[in-house]
Protein backbone atom coordinates (compact mmCIF):
# COMPACT_ATOMS: atom_id res chain seq x y z
CA UNK A 1 0.00 0.00 0.00
CA UNK A 2 0.99 3.60 -0.10
CA UNK A 3 3.28 4.93 2.63
CA UNK A 4 4.73 1.41 2.94
CA UNK A 5 7.85 1.63 0.84
CA UNK A 6 9.28 -1.25 -1.10
CA UNK A 7 12.43 -1.79 0.91
CA UNK A 8 13.81 -5.28 0.66
CA UNK A 9 14.44 -6.56 4.16
CA UNK A 10 17.12 -8.95 3.01
CA UNK A 11 18.85 -6.26 0.94
CA UNK A 12 18.80 -3.70 3.74
CA UNK A 13 19.79 -6.11 6.51
CA UNK A 14 22.10 -8.89 5.25
CA UNK A 15 21.72 -10.79 8.53
CA UNK A 16 17.96 -10.79 8.21
CA UNK A 17 17.45 -14.42 9.38
CA UNK A 18 18.82 -13.41 12.81
CA UNK A 19 15.67 -11.40 13.55
CA UNK A 20 12.72 -13.27 14.96
CA UNK A 21 9.68 -12.22 12.94
CA UNK A 22 6.20 -13.52 13.60
CA UNK A 23 4.16 -14.52 10.58
CA UNK A 24 1.01 -12.44 10.94
CA UNK A 25 -0.36 -13.98 7.76
CA UNK A 26 -0.91 -17.33 9.46
CA UNK A 27 -4.23 -18.15 11.08
CA UNK A 28 -3.00 -18.10 14.65
CA UNK A 29 -3.72 -16.29 17.86
CA UNK A 30 -1.24 -13.57 16.90
CA UNK A 31 -4.04 -11.70 15.12
CA UNK A 32 -5.82 -10.91 18.37
CA UNK A 33 -3.24 -8.96 20.28
CA UNK A 34 -0.09 -10.63 19.02
CA UNK A 35 3.20 -8.99 19.94
CA UNK A 36 6.26 -8.28 17.88
CA UNK A 37 9.55 -8.49 19.64
CA UNK A 38 12.98 -7.95 18.19
CA UNK A 39 15.69 -10.31 19.32
CA UNK A 40 18.54 -8.04 18.34
CA UNK A 41 17.84 -4.55 19.69
CA UNK A 42 21.45 -3.44 19.39
CA UNK A 43 21.62 -3.66 15.61
CA UNK A 44 18.04 -2.91 14.53
CA UNK A 45 17.62 0.67 15.75
CA UNK A 46 14.17 1.41 14.40
CA UNK A 47 12.28 -1.72 15.52
CA UNK A 48 12.65 -1.98 19.28
CA UNK A 49 10.06 -2.77 21.90
CA UNK A 50 6.85 -4.73 21.68
CA UNK A 51 3.87 -3.93 19.54
CA UNK A 52 0.27 -4.99 19.90
CA UNK A 53 -2.12 -5.10 17.00
CA UNK A 54 -5.76 -5.29 17.98
CA UNK A 55 -8.24 -6.17 15.26
CA UNK A 56 -11.83 -5.89 16.47
CA UNK A 57 -14.35 -5.30 13.72
CA UNK A 58 -13.22 -2.50 11.42
CA UNK A 59 -10.75 -1.00 13.89
CA UNK A 60 -7.44 -0.72 12.09
CA UNK A 61 -5.66 1.33 14.72
CA UNK A 62 -2.14 0.37 15.69
CA UNK A 63 -1.58 0.35 19.44
CA UNK A 64 2.02 1.30 20.15
CA UNK A 65 3.11 0.29 23.60
CA UNK A 66 6.68 1.39 23.10
CA UNK A 67 8.03 4.19 25.25
CA UNK A 68 11.13 5.02 23.23
CA UNK A 69 11.59 7.30 20.21
CA UNK A 70 12.26 6.71 16.54
CA UNK A 71 10.26 5.60 13.54
CA UNK A 72 7.63 2.89 13.70
CA UNK A 73 8.41 -0.38 12.01
CA UNK A 74 5.56 -2.51 10.76
CA UNK A 75 7.09 -5.59 9.24
CA UNK A 76 5.24 -8.75 8.36
CA UNK A 77 6.74 -12.16 7.94
CA UNK A 78 9.24 -11.73 5.17
CA UNK A 79 10.50 -15.26 5.15
CA UNK A 80 7.13 -16.90 5.76
CA UNK A 81 5.35 -15.37 2.82
CA UNK A 82 2.66 -13.70 4.96
CA UNK A 83 1.25 -10.24 4.42
CA UNK A 84 0.22 -7.73 7.08
CA UNK A 85 -1.90 -5.83 4.58
CA UNK A 86 -3.71 -9.04 3.71
CA UNK A 87 -4.71 -9.50 7.36
CA UNK A 88 -5.43 -5.83 8.02
CA UNK A 89 -7.67 -5.37 5.01
CA UNK A 90 -9.18 -8.80 4.44
CA UNK A 91 -9.91 -10.14 7.90
CA UNK A 92 -13.66 -9.86 7.22
CA UNK A 93 -13.65 -11.04 3.63
CA UNK A 94 -12.08 -14.35 2.54
CA UNK A 95 -11.97 -13.21 -1.08
CA UNK A 96 -9.97 -10.14 -0.14
CA UNK A 97 -7.66 -12.22 2.01
CA UNK A 98 -7.07 -14.69 -0.79
CA UNK A 99 -6.42 -11.91 -3.26
CA UNK A 100 -3.84 -10.29 -1.01
CA UNK A 101 -2.16 -13.53 0.09
CA UNK A 102 0.76 -14.17 -2.27
CA UNK A 103 3.37 -16.95 -2.17
CA UNK A 104 6.98 -16.14 -1.48
CA UNK A 105 7.98 -16.70 -5.09
CA UNK A 106 5.40 -14.39 -6.65
CA UNK A 107 6.44 -11.88 -9.27
CA UNK A 108 5.66 -8.19 -9.38
CA UNK A 109 3.25 -8.60 -12.27
CA UNK A 110 1.21 -11.33 -10.55
CA UNK A 111 1.06 -9.35 -7.33
CA UNK A 112 -0.19 -6.31 -9.21
CA UNK A 113 -2.80 -8.37 -11.01
CA UNK A 114 -4.05 -9.82 -7.73
CA UNK A 115 -4.28 -6.37 -6.18
CA UNK A 116 -6.27 -5.05 -9.13
CA UNK A 117 -8.42 -8.16 -9.61
CA UNK A 118 -12.22 -7.87 -9.20
CA UNK A 119 -12.16 -10.64 -6.59
CA UNK A 120 -11.05 -8.17 -3.94
CA UNK A 121 -14.60 -6.87 -3.44
CA UNK A 122 -15.05 -3.12 -3.39
CA UNK A 123 -11.54 -2.51 -2.14
CA UNK A 124 -10.00 0.40 -4.00
CA UNK A 125 -6.22 0.29 -3.89
CA UNK A 126 -3.18 1.57 -5.68
CA UNK A 127 -4.76 3.60 -8.47
CA UNK A 128 -5.79 6.42 -6.14
CA UNK A 129 -2.84 6.19 -3.78
CA UNK A 130 -0.23 8.92 -3.81
CA UNK A 131 2.79 6.72 -3.12
CA UNK A 132 4.38 3.56 -4.55
CA UNK A 133 2.74 0.16 -4.13
CA UNK A 134 3.92 -2.21 -1.48
CA UNK A 135 4.35 -5.37 -3.45
CA UNK A 136 7.89 -6.71 -3.78
CA UNK A 137 9.04 -9.50 -6.07
CA UNK A 138 10.12 -12.49 -4.03
CA UNK A 139 8.18 -11.79 -0.80
CA UNK A 140 5.03 -10.37 0.70
CA UNK A 141 7.18 -7.97 2.73
CA UNK A 142 5.79 -4.62 3.82
CA UNK A 143 8.23 -2.32 5.61
CA UNK A 144 7.61 1.23 6.76
CA UNK A 145 10.33 3.26 8.38
CA UNK A 146 8.73 6.64 7.85
CA UNK A 147 5.24 6.26 9.36
CA UNK A 148 4.40 9.05 11.83
CA UNK A 149 1.33 10.34 13.59
CA UNK A 150 0.61 12.82 10.79
CA UNK A 151 -0.26 10.02 8.35
CA UNK A 152 -3.80 10.51 7.08
CA UNK A 153 -5.70 7.23 7.09
CA UNK A 154 -9.36 7.31 6.09
CA UNK A 155 -11.14 3.97 6.22
CA UNK A 156 -14.73 3.29 5.20
CA UNK A 157 -16.22 -0.19 5.63
CA UNK A 158 -19.14 -1.74 3.75
CA UNK A 159 -20.85 -5.10 3.36
CA UNK A 160 -20.07 -6.42 6.82
CA UNK A 161 -16.43 -5.46 6.69
CA UNK A 162 -16.00 -6.80 3.19
CA UNK A 163 -14.29 -3.78 1.63
CA UNK A 164 -12.17 -0.94 2.93
CA UNK A 165 -10.88 2.13 1.16
CA UNK A 166 -7.58 3.40 2.47
CA UNK A 167 -5.76 6.45 1.29
CA UNK A 168 -2.34 7.22 2.63
CA UNK A 169 -0.37 10.41 2.36
CA UNK A 170 3.19 9.91 1.31
CA UNK A 171 5.67 11.30 3.79
CA UNK A 172 8.95 10.41 2.23
CA UNK A 173 9.82 10.26 -1.48
CA UNK A 174 12.63 7.80 -0.98
CA UNK A 175 11.66 5.39 -3.72
CA UNK A 176 14.15 5.00 -6.53
CA UNK A 177 13.54 5.45 -10.25
CA UNK A 178 14.04 1.77 -10.98
CA UNK A 179 11.29 0.84 -8.54
CA UNK A 180 8.95 3.30 -10.22
CA UNK A 181 9.66 1.85 -13.64
CA UNK A 182 9.16 -1.71 -12.42
CA UNK A 183 5.93 -0.71 -10.71
CA UNK A 184 4.70 0.99 -13.89
CA UNK A 185 5.44 -2.09 -15.96
CA UNK A 186 3.74 -4.30 -13.38
CA UNK A 187 0.28 -2.71 -13.16
CA UNK A 188 -0.32 -1.95 -16.82
CA UNK A 189 0.83 1.65 -17.03
CA UNK A 190 -2.01 3.22 -14.97
CA UNK A 191 -1.03 6.78 -14.10
CA UNK A 192 -0.32 7.22 -10.38
CA UNK A 193 -0.50 10.85 -9.23
CA UNK A 194 2.72 11.84 -7.54
CA UNK A 195 3.45 15.22 -6.03
CA UNK A 196 7.18 14.85 -5.69
CA UNK A 197 7.95 12.94 -8.88
CA UNK A 198 5.99 14.64 -11.62
CA UNK A 199 8.33 13.28 -14.27
CA UNK A 200 7.26 9.75 -13.38
CA UNK A 201 3.67 10.60 -14.24
CA UNK A 202 4.71 12.07 -17.56
CA UNK A 203 6.32 8.79 -18.55
CA UNK A 204 3.11 6.85 -17.94
CA UNK A 205 0.54 6.61 -20.68
CA UNK A 206 -2.60 4.58 -21.03
CA UNK A 207 -2.56 1.60 -23.34
CA UNK A 208 -4.88 2.71 -26.19
CA UNK A 209 -4.26 6.40 -25.61
CA UNK A 210 -0.50 5.91 -25.58
CA UNK A 211 -0.62 3.87 -28.80
CA UNK A 212 -2.77 6.49 -30.50
CA UNK A 213 -0.47 9.26 -29.37
CA UNK A 214 2.56 7.34 -30.65
CA UNK A 215 0.92 6.85 -34.02
CA UNK A 216 0.06 10.54 -34.20
CA UNK A 217 3.61 11.58 -33.44
CA UNK A 218 4.97 9.11 -36.00
CA UNK A 219 2.62 10.37 -38.71
CA UNK A 220 3.54 13.98 -37.98
CA UNK A 221 7.24 13.23 -38.20
CA UNK A 222 6.94 11.72 -41.71
CA UNK A 223 6.53 14.08 -44.67
CA UNK A 224 3.12 13.92 -46.35
CA UNK A 225 2.99 11.69 -49.40
CA UNK A 226 2.33 13.57 -52.64
CA UNK A 227 0.51 11.66 -55.34
CA UNK A 228 0.79 12.50 -59.08
CA UNK A 229 -2.80 13.75 -59.25
CA UNK A 230 -2.03 16.25 -56.50
CA UNK A 231 0.60 17.99 -58.60
CA UNK A 232 -0.25 20.85 -60.91
CA UNK A 233 0.33 20.57 -64.62
CA UNK A 234 2.71 23.49 -64.53
CA UNK A 235 4.75 25.64 -62.19
CA UNK A 236 2.91 28.93 -61.94
CA UNK A 237 3.47 29.97 -58.33
CA UNK A 238 7.26 30.04 -58.48
CA UNK A 239 8.26 32.73 -60.97
CA UNK A 240 11.84 33.20 -59.82
CA UNK A 241 14.73 30.87 -60.46
CA UNK A 242 17.78 30.21 -58.31
CA UNK A 243 19.66 33.18 -59.80
CA UNK A 244 16.78 35.63 -59.35
CA UNK A 245 15.57 35.35 -62.94
CA UNK A 246 12.12 34.24 -63.95
CA UNK A 247 11.83 30.47 -64.02
CA UNK A 248 11.25 28.88 -67.41
CA UNK A 249 7.69 27.54 -67.65
CA UNK A 250 7.50 23.95 -68.83
CA UNK A 251 4.31 23.57 -70.85
CA UNK A 252 2.80 20.17 -71.31
CA UNK A 253 2.05 18.63 -74.69
CA UNK A 254 -1.67 19.29 -74.29
CA UNK A 255 -1.13 22.94 -73.36
CA UNK A 256 1.22 23.54 -76.29
CA UNK A 257 -1.23 21.94 -78.73
CA UNK A 258 -4.14 24.06 -77.54
CA UNK A 259 -2.08 27.25 -77.68
CA UNK A 260 -0.91 26.45 -81.20
CA UNK A 261 -4.49 25.90 -82.36
CA UNK A 262 -5.57 29.20 -80.84
CA UNK A 263 -2.63 31.01 -82.42
CA UNK A 264 -3.52 29.53 -85.78
CA UNK A 265 -6.94 31.23 -85.69
CA UNK A 266 -6.10 34.36 -83.70
CA UNK A 267 -2.60 35.78 -83.47
CA UNK A 268 -3.82 38.42 -81.03
CA UNK A 269 -6.08 37.56 -78.15
CA UNK A 270 -8.62 39.71 -76.40
CA UNK A 271 -8.63 39.87 -72.61
CA UNK A 272 -11.80 37.82 -72.37
CA UNK A 273 -10.42 35.06 -74.60
CA UNK A 274 -7.13 35.08 -72.70
CA UNK A 275 -8.98 34.52 -69.41
CA UNK A 276 -10.94 31.62 -70.92
CA UNK A 277 -7.79 29.91 -72.19
CA UNK A 278 -6.00 30.46 -68.88
CA UNK A 279 -8.83 28.75 -67.00
CA UNK A 280 -9.05 25.92 -69.52
CA UNK A 281 -5.32 25.16 -69.47
CA UNK A 282 -4.69 25.91 -65.76
CA UNK A 283 -2.34 28.74 -66.66
CA UNK A 284 -2.16 32.39 -65.69
CA UNK A 285 -3.05 35.27 -67.99
CA UNK A 286 0.54 36.45 -67.85
CA UNK A 287 1.81 33.09 -69.11
CA UNK A 288 -0.75 33.11 -71.96
CA UNK A 289 0.25 36.65 -72.92
CA UNK A 290 3.98 35.88 -72.85
CA UNK A 291 3.51 32.70 -74.87
CA UNK A 292 1.58 34.57 -77.57
CA UNK A 293 4.23 37.30 -77.64
CA UNK A 294 6.99 34.75 -78.11
CA UNK A 295 4.95 32.86 -80.68
CA UNK A 296 4.32 36.03 -82.69
CA UNK A 297 8.04 36.88 -82.61
CA UNK A 298 8.84 33.40 -83.85
CA UNK A 299 6.20 33.67 -86.55
CA UNK A 300 7.59 37.02 -87.74
CA UNK A 301 11.08 35.63 -87.76
CA UNK A 302 9.99 32.63 -89.80
CA UNK A 303 8.17 34.85 -92.27
CA UNK A 304 11.19 37.12 -92.60
CA UNK A 305 13.52 34.20 -93.29
CA UNK A 306 11.04 32.78 -95.77
CA UNK A 307 10.75 36.10 -97.59
CA UNK A 308 14.53 36.48 -97.66
CA UNK A 309 14.97 32.98 -99.06
CA UNK A 310 12.43 33.70 -101.76
CA UNK A 311 13.96 37.07 -102.64
CA UNK A 312 17.57 35.83 -102.92
CA UNK A 313 17.14 33.48 -105.93
CA UNK A 314 14.99 36.07 -107.70
CA UNK A 315 17.67 38.72 -107.39
CA UNK A 316 20.28 36.40 -108.83
CA UNK A 317 18.42 36.19 -112.12
CA UNK A 318 18.15 39.92 -112.42
CA UNK A 319 20.36 41.50 -115.15
Swiss-Prot record:
Q: Which domain of life is it from?
A: Eukaryota
Q: Where is the composition biased (Low complexity)?
A: 128-155
Give residue numbers for sequence motif Antp-type hexapeptide. 226-231
- Single GO molecular-function term? RNA polymerase II cis-regulatory region sequence-specific DNA binding
The entry's keywords: Developmental protein, DNA-binding, Homeobox, Nucleus, Transcription, Transcription regulation
Q: Which residues bind DNA?
A: 244-303
List GO BP terms, alphabetically: anterior/posterior pattern specification
Cellular component (GO) terms are: nucleus
Cell compartments where the protein resides? Nucleus
The reply on keyword Transcription is yes
Which residue intervals make up region (Disordered)?
A: 114-224
- SUPFAM superfamilies on file: Homeodomain-like (SSF46689)
Which purpose does this protein serve, as stated in its record? Sequence-specific transcription factor which is part of a developmental regulatory system that provides cells with specific positional identities on the anterior-posterior axis.
Family (UniProt): Belongs to the Antp homeobox family.
- Protein name as catalogued: Homeobox protein Hox-B5a
Species for this entry? Takifugu rubripes (Japanese pufferfish)
Supply the source organism's classification: Eukaryota, Metazoa, Chordata, Craniata, Vertebrata
Q: Which gene encodes it?
A: hoxb5a
